[in-house]
């Protein structure tokens, strides 16, 4: 058995090597969380993504409405392992995707589908984004909440932990997400909205993290180089629907002021609500303040429009539903808006 002190020494050496490697690369906002970079090799996607079963396509390990014939969301990337020990267990180092600070980790795999997982907050051009790393076998010894980490710094070891179905050795992977935080008051909202249900992770519950597609981000960054801009990427999400909310003071506005648009009418008359563009995953990527004179309904939430082509392509979040000839906010859509504006 390897002595714990020696284990820590190995970690230190590994971190040092990773720092040297990272410093030799052109700096980009995000780096791969493991040494598996085959995403950039056309035709080799099956070497990067872990599918859900041997007979399923690699796309089932990618982001979006990729499971259950398009009706189940997978909110991240399942990145395949590259190395194993003698027992066939993954040993790949997992690294921070960008400079940031550890805001949460869980070492109780029975409490989450993520198993052991870490959440890191990053500030990219003034915009806060949160990376998540799931199914870890071990978190780096001594890692603390609040600790600063550098891009490429070792934070964990890949594993197969989960409280759901067993992850087979052949598809061992790290589950990787890039998210916007929905509401600082999540714990209070959850207690009210989900009476009797447990919330073991506070505001770092997966329901409070709205995912963007890391594959699209990494590919755009690879193609655009230093011209890549995360804010522009978010602002250019495909709109699923547009809603009007009669709420004027919710945390998302303060956390993401760069997503709030200008409206001279509301600036002059006062803000009575917000017109919000949502992508298929419920990410609010454009928020327009509206004056009372611009709002036609007294309803707390009003569905203004639906992009039917996008809803057909990506229906899995079930935010809207068509009843007869008319679209309505579905229960999941109403729940998302209740959380956003709580």
Which functions belong to the PLM regions below?
Residues 26-116, 199-342:
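Surface-exposed, glycine-biased beta-strand/turn segments
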Residues 89-91, 97-140, 169, 173-175:
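Zn2+-dependent peptidoglycan hydrolase active-site motif and core
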Residues 97, 143-144, 149:
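Surface-exposed strand-loop junctions at beta-sheet edges and helix termini
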Residues 112, 117-120, 147-225:
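Conserved, short, structured surface segments that act as functional micro-motifs
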Residues 11-21:
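Bacterial N-terminal signal peptides
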Residues 80-83, 131-140, 160-165, 195-201:
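Short helix/strand-bridging catalytic loops that position acidic/His residues to coordinate divalent metals
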Residues 1-7:
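N-terminal secretory signal peptides that target proteins for export/translocation
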């Amino acid at each position: 058995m390897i002595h714990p002190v020696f284990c820590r020494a190995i970690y230190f050496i590994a971190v040092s090597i990773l720092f040297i490697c990272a410093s030799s690369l052109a700096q980009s906002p995000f780096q791969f969380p493991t040494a598996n970079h085959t995403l950039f090799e056309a035709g080799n996607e099956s070497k990067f993504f872990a599918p859900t079963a041997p007979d399923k396509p690699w796309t089932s390990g990618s982001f979006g409405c990729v499971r259950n014939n398009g009706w189940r969301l997978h909110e991240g990337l399942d990145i395949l392992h590259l190395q194993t020990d003698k027992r066939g267990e993954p040993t790949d180092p997992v690294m921070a995707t960008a400079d940031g600070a550890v805001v949460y980790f869980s070492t109780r795999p029975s409490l989450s589908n993520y198993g052991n997982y870490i959440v890191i907050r990053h500030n990219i051009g003034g915009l806060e984004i949160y990376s998540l790393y799931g199914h870890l076998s071990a978190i780096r010894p001594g890692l603390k909440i609040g600790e600063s980490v550098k891009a490429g710094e070792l934070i964990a070891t890949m594993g197969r932990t989960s409280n759901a179905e067993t992850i087979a050795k052949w598809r061992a992977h790290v589950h990787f997400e890039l998210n916007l935080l929905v509401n600082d008051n999540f714990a209070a909202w959850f207690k009210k909205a989900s009476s009797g249900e447990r919330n073991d992770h506070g505001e770092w519950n997966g329901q409070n993290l709205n995912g963007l597609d890391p594959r699209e981000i990494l590919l755009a960054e690879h193609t655009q180089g230093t011209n890549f801009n995360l804010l522009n990427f978010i602002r250019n999400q495909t709109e699923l629907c547009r809603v009007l909310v009669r709420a004027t003071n919710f945390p998302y506005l303060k956390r993401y002021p760069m997503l709030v648009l200008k409206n001279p009418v509301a600036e002059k008359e006062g803000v009575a609500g917000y017109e919000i563009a949502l992508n298929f995953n419920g990410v609010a990527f454009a928020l327009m303040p509206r004056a009372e004179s611009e709002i036609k309904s007294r309803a707390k939430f009003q569905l203004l429009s639906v992009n039917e082509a996008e809803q057909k392509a990506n229906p899995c979040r079930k935010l809207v539903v068509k009843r007869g000839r008319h679209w309505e906010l579905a229960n999941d859509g109403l729940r998302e808006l209740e959380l956003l504006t709580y």
